[in-house]
């Protein structure tokens, strides 16, 4: 159960992280 909602959150975080990484570069 915890991994289920965690996977959904991780997917969103991954998208946001990609944007942050491009800004840092």
Swiss-Prot record:
Misc note: Initially thought to be part of the large ribosomal subunit. Crystal structures show eS32/eL41 to be a small ribosomal subunit forming a bridge at the interface of the 2 subunits.
Name of the protein this chain belongs to: Small ribosomal subunit protein eS32
Subunit structure and binding partners: Component of the small ribosomal subunit.
InterPro entries the record matches: Ribosomal_eS32
GO cellular component, one term: ribosome
Any GO BP: translation
Region (Disordered): 1-25
GO MF annotations, alphabetized: structural constituent of ribosome
Family listed: Belongs to the eukaryotic ribosomal protein eS32 family.
Keywords: Ribonucleoprotein, Ribosomal protein
